[in-house]
């Protein structure tokens, strides 16, 4: 990992996919704030074009050059950038311009105060989050693959169709299932799609993976938590409908057929997520999920 100490962030990149003018204004304000403090600032090329700024860079260039990446947007933006930038080991920090903000935890109204604490005073922590790698194997060869920070969801292309499959963990048969699909979630993703399907919440530091059935056709089907270093593979009944799909973080889709085998395991890439020094996961969790406050 790149060395990160007080005032060691010299080259900082700004990325995100602004959906409205307010978010775009945040990009410009952060750019000007960083330039005023004599940082070398890179801007993702599409944003740079919209704002008519210099130093527009492709994501790959940002990963190779930047010491820190500021993601401005919602969790969806952070997910996309995590998949693209994790392999470069560059830390990411998020300014929330979306809805939930589990991953982008800097509030826009206090962004500059919090960035000052982080960048100028070195008051930050870095958390490591692992990703999953999903592969499609056809006739013994990997034909496509992608990463996911939240979850790998395996389901029919058409909605309201069941599929039947077998799940193997570390090459050992675990269970078979008839359902609308299966969610394979990281601890990061345990508060996303997995949670809405009845899955457990896993704290981010756990080395664990959750297997969560989607509308199973048996009352005995329950979520299962396994070791994070497990290798998961799925085989599908040949009479399933021909068009199946892997969805990575709900953003990237990989089509496959019942003849293919699906392999899911921990990716070698690690997301380095930067938080302010006073970051508390349980405070964020309680706030987002509406938990009760302290009694004493």
Curated annotation (Swiss-Prot):
One of its GO terms (molecular function) is metal ion binding. One of its GO terms (biological process) is NADP biosynthetic process. Its cofactor is a divalent metal cation. The keyword tRNA-binding does not apply. It holds the Pfam family NAD_kinase_C. Signal peptide: none annotated. GO terms for cellular component: cytoplasm. Belongs to the NAD kinase family. HAMAP family: NAD_kinase (MF_00361). This is NAD kinase. The lineage of its organism: Bacteria, Pseudomonadati, Pseudomonadota, Gammaproteobacteria, Pasteurellales.
């Amino acid at each position: 990992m790149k060395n990160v100490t007080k005032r060691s962030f010299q080259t900082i990149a700004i990325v995100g996919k602004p959906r409205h003018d307010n978010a775009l204004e945040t990009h410009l304000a952060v750019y000007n704030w960083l330039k005023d403090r004599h940082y070398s600032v890179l801007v993702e090329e599409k944003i740079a074009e919209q704002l008519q700024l210099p130093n527009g860079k492709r994501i790959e260039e940002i990963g190779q050059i930047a010491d820190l990446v500021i993601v401005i947007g919602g969790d969806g933006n952070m997910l996309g950038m995590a998949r693209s930038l994790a392999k470069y080991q560059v830390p990411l920090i998020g300014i929330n311009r979306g809805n939930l903000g589990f991953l982008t935890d800097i509030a826009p109204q206090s962004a500059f105060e919090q960035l000052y604490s982080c960048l100028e005073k070195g008051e930050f922590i870095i958390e490591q989050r692992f990703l999953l790698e999903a592969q499609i194997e056809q006739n013994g060869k990997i034909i496509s693959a992608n990463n996911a920070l939240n979850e790998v969801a395996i389901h029919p292309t058409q909605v309201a169709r069941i599929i039947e499959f077998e799940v193997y963990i570390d090459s050992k048969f675990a269970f078979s299932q008839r359902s609308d699909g299966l969610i394979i979630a990281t601890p990061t993703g345990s508060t996303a799609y997995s949670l809405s399907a009845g899955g457990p919440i896993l704290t981010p530091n756990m080395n664990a993976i959750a297997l969560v059935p989607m509308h199973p056709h048996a009352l005995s089907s329950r979520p299962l938590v396994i070791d994070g270093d497990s290798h998961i593979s799925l085989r599908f009944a040949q009479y399933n409908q021909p068009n199946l799909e892997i969805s990575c973080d709900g953003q990237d889709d990989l089509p496959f057929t019942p003849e293919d085998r699906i392999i899911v395991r921990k990716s070698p890439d690690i997301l380095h997520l930067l938080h302010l020094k006073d970051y508390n996961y349980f405070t964020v969790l309680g706030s987002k999920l509406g938990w009760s406050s302290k009694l004493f």
